[in-house]
């Protein structure tokens, strides 16, 4: 099993190094969806688990009520909906099968279960983890690595996994050269654009949104300036 990780500086490189071992003969575009899909799965599972434990602690029996997750509010009182993750798709259910030859199929089924419970995600999540070309032993090692992140000691899992997601995107961009412009604009450029726009309120529209970096940076801008995220609407196409 992978060693415990502190998620300090260099954590993103460790994620990339471990994930890159899975590549084998998989096409670059499909490999990208595997790596980023796994990060997304861990993120929504962690966020669901935090809300789940909060509801359990309240002791009113609403921890399996989907509406409680859709109506979730953050500590600032703003709506912060949480995707409902069914039991078979929660990270703990996946982690116990990390060293099983069926780990790819288990992850694919988890993605399907999440799509079924969250119509907004229908036909969006990657479901190619069971393909023969993907090294299941390496996949299990990456699952272990994610499992062993001590989130409670190193801040919000959203920040940690967000860093990993952005770092992996940049590495894919490096590997794909000029073609990467189809899905990725360097974060420093997007951040500069957002600082010029100062999106405190109104609409943020990106006609070539790719991986959604403009929207992420806009949300971070509002948070950094103590604004209200509910004062903006984001629109994008690609």
Task: Show where each model-derived region lies.
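Non-catalytic, mostly N-terminal accessory regions of nucleic-acid modification and defense proteins
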Residues: 1-200
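Conserved S-adenosyl-L-methionine
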Residues: 179-238
